[in-house]
């Protein structure tokens, strides 16, 4: 395993203030938040969410930032309306049984295949936070991955085999937290070794003073978290800007 299974920290977070500018549509059978005016035949970013799903305000604000940078952005509901909420009790084991990797992979694969078939974008970037990172990695695989580049933050559930399967021509940006038992130092180092061995194009950034989840739902009233969260988004935009033009 390149990152451990999701844990309690994956179900904790802070909601950020702001008014989303995008719109909700049914796209390829999934409730989807769409942002941007760029043609979907040009540059597209698909955001694969954590367990908070595609109605959580934070991810919508993030999508708007990507849209402002010139991308058509889609945030599909890969949880089929079963996102968790901080103010409601949750049986984590039961939730993960409903949203196993096998179940979620079919949902993500279906959306990506139809996106490619319908629009055939010139560039597809895929972003994955925590739970969603596994499926982002799968879509830069040399075995059927449909994205051109990926950016993931504090990943969970990613296997070493999925890291090894990454197409060396498809770049991956990994943003990691210093305090993270889901993606701890030993698994970070193992991930680096595999990427290096496979001659992958990669960048791995480690942020001090932050914990798992910081890029998606961190408490931005804390200066270190605010800096790291904002820096990750800037890095992701720069990453996709660069690799969509090479």
Swiss-Prot record:
Keywords: Cytoplasm. Belongs to the AIM2 family. It comes from the Eukaryota. Its main location: cytoplasm. One of its GO terms (cellular component) is cytoplasm. InterPro entries: AB_hydrolase_fold, Dienelactn_hydro. This is Protein AIM2. GO terms for molecular function: hydrolase activity. It is found in: Cytoplasm. Present with 1800 molecules/cell in log phase SD medium.
């Amino acid at each position: 395993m390149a990152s451990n299974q999701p844990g309690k920290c994956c179900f904790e977070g802070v909601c950020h203030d702001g008014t989303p500018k995008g719109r909700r549509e049914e796209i390829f059978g999934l409730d989807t938040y769409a942002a941007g005016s760029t043609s979907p035949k040009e540059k597209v970013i698909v955001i694969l969410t954590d367990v908070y799903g595609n109605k959580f305000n934070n991810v919508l604000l993030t999508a708007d930032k990507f849209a402002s940078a010139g991308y058509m952005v889609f945030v599909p509901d890969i949880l089929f309306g079963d996102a968790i909420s901080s103010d409601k009790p949750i049986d984590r084991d039961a939730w993960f049984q409903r949203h196993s990797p096998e179940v979620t992979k079919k949902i993500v694969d279906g959306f990506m295949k139809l996106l490619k078939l319908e629009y055939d974008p010139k560039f597809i970037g895929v972003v994955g936070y925590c739970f969603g990172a596994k499926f982002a990695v799968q879509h830069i695989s040399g075995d059927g991955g449909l994205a051109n580049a990926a950016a993931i933050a504090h990943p969970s559930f990613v296997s070493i085999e999925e890291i090894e399967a990454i197409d060396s021509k498809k770049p991956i940006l990994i943003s990691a937290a210093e305090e993270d038992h889901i993606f701890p130092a030993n698994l970070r180092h193992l991930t680096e070794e595999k990427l290096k061995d496979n001659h992958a194009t990669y960048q791995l950034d480690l942020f001090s003073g932050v914990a798992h989840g910081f890029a998606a739902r961190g408490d931005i009233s804390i200066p270190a978290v605010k800096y790291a969260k904002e820096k990750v988004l800037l890095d992701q935009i720069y990453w996709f800007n660069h690799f969509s033009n090479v």
